[in-house]
From Swiss-Prot:
Organism of provenance: Sheeppox virus (strain InS-1) (SPPV)
Recorded family membership: Belongs to the poxviruses B9 family.
Protein name: T4 protein
Domain of life, source organism: Viruses
InterPro entries, A to Z: Apoptosis_reg_M-T4, M-T4_sf, Poxvirus_T4p_C, Poxvirus_T4p_N
One Pfam entry name: Pox_T4_N
Gene3D superfamilies, sorted: 2.60.240.30
Length: 240
């Protein structure tokens, strides 16, 4: 083989290798890198009562949202006041599934298509979720856990009323569209036993059972005094 022939062979091999490598490289657009989603999953095991598959209701306020149904309420809000931010609460979607004849309820509270994650005020990145029992009229007997995403400066705090809840497992996922397509980063799992399966349903299978919560109407008479602080945060009320 002459030197020229060998050179041409090497050049063709280089071009072929580069082409194949180029095909295998997974690239993301700027939009995918800057579009975020947040998903909070709660597997709630009930205590001394069974949830009923009557559906749930979501009520949205500027500072948060609340859900009703199945023997408990969930209050979700950030730390912002009306004066501190013009941004609405970043979580805006609620889905629910009831398992094992009402012994387990899986709640998914989420949002997608966030393009302002890095520019959000600090108060909007401090998210609290509280599970409160309908039948308990006094202060919550609570268990508190938290998780932080330092890269995004996000913090989540979950408070559970153990008067009606036997057990809660929780997951928090923060990722952009690029991560969602190619890698499973961004997920943090926390809970009593670091398990996010619910009853006999695996985490990856919840999507097959989830139903969207209907839009409800706020009625302050449904809420006990110890729940009023959550309401004030969600609706930016100074008093009730």
């Amino acid at each position: 083989m002459s030197s020229l022939t060998f050179f041409i062979f090497c050049l063709q091999l280089f071009i072929f290798t580069s082409t194949v490598s180029g095909i295998s490289i997974k690239r993301c657009t700027e939009e995918e890198n800057n579009t975020w989603e947040i998903e909070v999953g709660l597997c709630i095991q009930t205590e001394n009562f069974r949830a009923i598959k009557t559906g749930c209701y979501k009520i949205q306020g500027p500072g948060g949202l609340l859900t009703e149904g199945n023997g408990f309420k969930i209050f979700a809000h950030d730390d912002c006041s009306k004066e501190k931010t013009q941004n609405n609460f970043i979580l805006d979607s609620v889905n629910e599934a009831v398992y094992a004849l009402g012994k387990y309820v899986y709640m998914e509270i989420s949002t997608s298509n966030i393009t302002t994650l890095n520019s959000l005020p600090q108060c909007a990145k401090r998210i609290s979720l509280s599970i409160s029992c309908d039948q308990v009229t006094t202060e919550m007997k609570s268990y508190v856990e938290s998780v932080s995403f330092k890269d995004y400066d996000l913090e989540f705090v979950i408070t559970t009323d153990i008067s009606c809840v036997k057990h809660v497992s929780s997951s928090v996922i923060v990722r952009n569209e690029c991560e969602k397509k190619y890698i499973s980063t961004g997920k943090k799992i926390f809970g009593f036993n670091n398990k996010i399966d619910c009853s006999a349903v695996k985490f990856s299978e919840h999507v097959n059972y989830l139903k969207t919560c209907s839009v409800g109407k706020f009625d302050r008479k449904k809420y006990y005094e110890h729940q009023h602080n959550y309401i004030k945060k969600i609706f930016h009320h100074n008093e009730l």
